[in-house]
């Protein structure tokens, strides 16, 4: 058996794996256990009551967190004409068409989000094998293929998170940084859960939000008592 590190022993002693924590208590615990030399992200895992094997029960979308994610996001936009100018004005770092595609083909990937206007998809389509595996391919379901590229850029900069269930029906995303105030993390979590409830597939039966867990980048997961979450209770 692998030897437990000092950090792992502290986590084991502090976190009760059988307990569901009130959100405020959970955040306080995560802050206490976040001892990395960088500001760790607070990540959430939401187990959904869906059959992920069925395409009509998959959950995918995006929402803007009210308090952002604490991350600086670089945005690339495929657009031309007035849309290109609007994207630049909204703060996009990279804007172009074939010239931007050529940069990406050369391996220049200095961005976190890719947005495209519908008329630019003829150019973006040829980049599927590069952008797809990295989760960067623009998609109308998450608002990254849109005629209003300026709004999409502003959303990305404001702390929009994209979500998509994995093969086990679990959503993984971030809701901020461990140095956020507890209330801000709770507000972000509530906003995500509201978005997930709105995205509930009509074919999903039974309990939809089955489990909510929070963790930091380097820490253990803490199960959340859903009775204290307005988004779940309502």
Swiss-Prot record:
Protein name per the record: Large ribosomal subunit protein uL1
Keywords: Repressor, Ribonucleoprotein, Ribosomal protein, RNA-binding, rRNA-binding, Translation regulation, tRNA-binding
GO molecular function: rRNA binding; structural constituent of ribosome; tRNA binding
GO cellular component, one term: cytosolic large ribosomal subunit
Gene3D superfamilies noted in UniProt: 3.30.190.20, 3.40.50.790
Transmembrane segment boundaries: none
Family: Belongs to the universal ribosomal protein uL1 family.
Top-level division of the source organism's lineage: Bacteria
Originating species: Serratia proteamaculans (strain 568)
Function: Binds directly to 23S rRNA. The L1 stalk is quite mobile in the ribosome, and is involved in E site tRNA release. Protein L1 is also a translational repressor protein, it controls the translation of the L11 operon by binding to its mRNA.
GO biological process annotation, one example: regulation of translation
Pfam families: Ribosomal_L1 (PF00687)
């Amino acid at each position: 058996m692998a030897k437990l590190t000092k950090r792992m022993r502290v986590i084991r002693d502090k976190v009760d794996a059988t307990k569901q924590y009130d959100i405020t208590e959970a955040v306080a615990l995560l802050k206490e256990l976040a001892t990395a030399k960088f500001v760790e992200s607070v990540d959430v895992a939401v187990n959904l009551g869906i059959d992920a094997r069925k395409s009509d029960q998959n959950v995918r979308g995006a929402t803007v967190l009210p308090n952002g994610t604490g991350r600086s996001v670089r945005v690339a936009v495929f657009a031309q004409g007035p849309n290109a100018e609007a994207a630049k004005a909204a703060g996009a770092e990279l804007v172009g068409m074939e010239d931007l595609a050529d940069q990406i083909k050369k391996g220049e990937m200095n961005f976190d989000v890719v947005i495209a206007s519908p008329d630019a998809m003829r150019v973006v389509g040829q980049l599927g094998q590069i952008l797809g595996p990295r989760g960067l391919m623009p998609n109308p379901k998450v608002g990254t293929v849109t005629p209003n590229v300026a709004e999409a850029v502003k959303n990305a900069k404001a702390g929009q998170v994209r979500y998509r269930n994995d093969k086990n029906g679990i959503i993984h995303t971030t809701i901020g940084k461990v140095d956020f105030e507890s209330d801000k993390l709770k507000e972000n979590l509530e906003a995500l859960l509201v978005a997930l409830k709105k995205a509930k597939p009509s074919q999903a039966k039974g309990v939809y939000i089955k489990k909510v867990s929070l963790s930091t980048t380097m820490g253990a997961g803490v199960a959340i008592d859903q009775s204290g979450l307005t988004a779940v209770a309502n």
